[in-house]
Amino acid sequence: MVYTITCNPSLDYGVTVENFQMGHTNRTVTEQMNVGGKGINVSIVLKHLGIPTKILGFTAGFTGREIEKRIKEQEIEAEWIRLPQGDSRINVKLLSNEGTEINGQGPDISKKEVQELEEKLGILTKEDVLVLAGNVQKSLGQTFYADMMKKLKDRQIRTVVDASGELLKAVLPYHPFLIKPNQDELEGLFQVKDRKSVV
């Protein structure tokens, strides 16, 4: 089984606007609402490929309920930890002359709720794969994935990490099975931006 963790899932509201003008009323040409989050996206693809997968994550408020509903409609197995306060975030994706994204912060997660997630990971075996993907809330800190890997290191669970910046850098001492940085994330990790910098 491939387990994916999405700490900060979202509803992504995508709109297309012709010739967007700042400070004016703009009318949308198209609109769509999708569930977002890197871990969720991994599970969606795995489901389409016929590979057993399960989403683990945190949801909150009315947006969280909508995320849960949409994942259930896709018949993807999931276990959610429902947060008592706040709402799961809404991200706005504006496509006009240029693409613009406005991403929400997401609700805070307490130590108690992190402990609930760790308990759910107790059933994983060395036959399973764990995917840690996407950003995390400020309340979790930039060592969250590293802390998870530290607790799992003696259980021989293959871990895949798709993250950036300090969140990615912090996991490297724990030797994840695979990391998936894009070009921008690699540039940030190694502080290089061109071939000259590499040389």
Name what the model sees in each region:
Residues 1-23:
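Positively charged, low-complexity intrinsically disordered leader regions
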Residues 4-7, 57-58, 93-95, 103-105, ...:
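Short beta-strand segments
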Residues 19-27, 180-183:
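Short glycine/proline- and charge-enriched loop/turn segments
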Residues 27-87:
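Substrate-binding N-lobe of the ribokinase-like
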Residues 83, 93-126:
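Conserved phosphate-binding/catalytic loop of the ribokinase/pfkB sugar-kinase fold
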Residues 129-195:
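Conserved beta-alpha-beta core of the PfkB/ribokinase-like small-molecule kinase fold
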Residues 198-199:
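Conserved small/polar residues in nucleotide/adenosyl-binding loops
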